[in-house]
Amino acid sequence: MVTILGVISEEERGYVQRLRELIPGVKLQLTTRAPGTLAELHILVKMAGASGCFVTTPSAKLLVPDAISYTQDDFAGSCLNISGIDYVIMNDISQIVTTPTGKHLAARYLSKLTTPEVWPKTPAFRYELCSTPDEAKAALEVLRDADMIAYDIETVKSKLFFDVISFTGVFIAKHQAAEGWFKYSTRTYTFPHSDEVMQELIKQVLQLEIPKITQNGKYDNAYLIRWGMPPVMWYYDTAHFFHSWYAEMPKRLDFITAYSLRDIQFWKNSGEGSFENRAKYCGRDSWGTACTWMSFMERAPKWAMRNYLQEFPVSIACILPEHTGVELDSEAEGRLREYNIKIRDKKRASLAASVGLPDFNPGSWQQILKLVHALGAKDIKDTTPPSMDKFSVRHPLNQWFAEGFKEYKSAAKVVSNYTKDSVRLTDHAGKQWDKIFYCLNPQATDTGRLGSKESHFWCGLQIQNIKRDEDDEEAVSVKEMFAAPDGFYLGESDLEQAEARDTAYLSGDTALIKAVDCGKDFHSLNASSFFGVPYEEIYQDLEFIDFDGKVTKAGCKNKPLRNLSKRVNHGANYNMMEMVLLDTMGIRNVIKAKYLLNLPEGWGLLKVCAYLLSRFDITYPVVRGDYQEYIKRCIRQTQMLVGPTGWTRYCFADPTGNKRALNSYVAHPSQSLNAMVLNKAWWRIFTEIALVERKDFRLNAQIHDSILFCYRKGRQDLAYKVRDMMQVPVLVKDPYGIERTLCVPSALKGEGRTWATLKDMR
């Protein structure tokens, strides 16, 4: 029987039984002593008769005395053999209970001690710094014979430059055992990006017709493309593959390698100091990437590979839009900045005068909280929206302050986020570009939907969460900043009520299917069904002229009721309970709903919220009934949710006893199906329009349920082609085994010079 020792804290003793359940058949010895030296730790292991030891306390730093900095989370999963004893550094074992992935990770890391034979063999890190062209040429010749090549760069912010690149060649043995792990070796080289000769040699390696491996390679490739060195045969990416396998886990290289390889130690803080240290650090990155990819090929399930084959092409299709960006209208930017500075300064002066403190800062949560307490609301503990909502409804003065804080922060956010100098790209020559760049990331969410953030080049902004337009007629829309190039129009094609339609077909709720497919306004139809008001009093489908010549225009006739139905539908789809719906809608809106619906005076706000949710459940009984039970059953039986396109999510949490997990998993199928459909359309638009109509079309970005693009004036056919490609039919099977074909319709807007001025093109 294998014996291992655990060095834990006294606070972790309550989780020991859970720990024992992860390693049946293993003798587990534990100590809460805190050894002061490595020798003392060795003695503890030998006294326990153990072959290995895991450490969850700060004493683990004794195992890595040369570490420049140390945190337990960074080194978790590191496995070291010291004086013939295997040591594993782990996080606090309470995470077995307190985090969804804690149980899985603890079992994985402990197996480095209990069953080392099941882990793939990690080849030695054979490394060379090629400081001269002759050394680089010799490395190039070796790499020509590699079966795969992993690469990684280190960048310098000031010049948008990379100063070193590493290559790890993977050489697979000719003779492999019938069973067992891949036999392979690696050779790692780093090339300084120091002059044109070295640049040419780097380019030659990248142009070798050998499959390439990266970790989050869009970042590396952005700089390589910038410096005229695009790689060929970029097929493999460890971040995308790990997301395809375990979407709920981190995608950092250090985490992935600790999870995938046994004999690995955290190295991400070893690149400080000399260029030699930086180069070796870069080499370890590409070596870790190569070895991790090989471990994936050895043990990853087929469904993870199927996911990868869906996700990775989307990443490739993101590169061109990221480098294309969107034109920035400098005049609109100036007006936007001027308007919001005026609002910001006016609100700050008004609030400061009201409290009698010239230096009062409404952007400081500490100062706001002090004022809230001074106004008698000492039970308010923070300045989050739900807390400020509670504060505001207690007195008209509170409401005035709360709305003032909100307006100040909104204007200040526009100034700091959208009109800052760093929005523009400043190139290595110091030139500023009137363009907005950004990143689009297919591995940013658990559902497969693209995320966004600032550009790889330290500029730009997150393009998906653009601030909504103000009601004030004088306000300048943030979207006015985003413009089409000369001779082009901007266009946007949007999947209409995509998540509601997805939920209807996935759940098999026939009432909801009828509602989304009948052709009437969905939210007005819901308002009628939820609250018993005739549809015709809420929405007018067609414009008409009566006998007296009076024109009745099409559109919404009762916005408050329609907006209320939208909030209730959103809350129910995301499985909110009364308290969360109250926080989401806000106290004031719930009070409005109470009087709008003539609900009893004696009802409290939570009862109003419960009533609102009950109206959804009565109208669509399957969504929060049989459908939720089906989702819980799938996870209980397989730990997976499989969508109509085959995209599979591994689920670590138990939705039966975890409300947060249940909410996440209930929302997943419709969000993921929407993402998969949008990604299919994205790939088609990229390959069939963007790459073919290069003079007349620009693919810009995914924006949640829509795709933003530019088309040359006179080429409206390309805009309609985008709309048609967005409409992807998918065969969906509901929990009752009934199959239906879902095709979400796509709306189209275009013919606008800016994003704010798009016109309906239906």
Task: Identify the residue ranges that each predicted region occupies.
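A common structural junction motif
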Residues: 724-735
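Conserved catalytic palm subdomain of right-hand nucleotidyl-transferase polymerases, strongest
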Residues: 149-151, 235-240, 482-499, 581
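Short active-site loop/helix that positions an aromatic residue
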Residues: 158-159, 218-230, 243-245, 369-376, ...
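Conserved RNase H-like, two-metal-ion catalytic cores of nucleic-acid enzymes
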Residues: 2-8, 12-30, 120-255, 259, ...
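Conserved "right-hand" nucleotidyltransferase catalytic core of DNA-directed polymerases
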Residues: 115-187, 259-260, 267, 274-474, ...
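A polyanion-binding, active-site-adjacent surface
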Residues: 1-119
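Conserved catalytic core of nucleic-acid polymerases
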Residues: 319, 323, 378, 437, ...
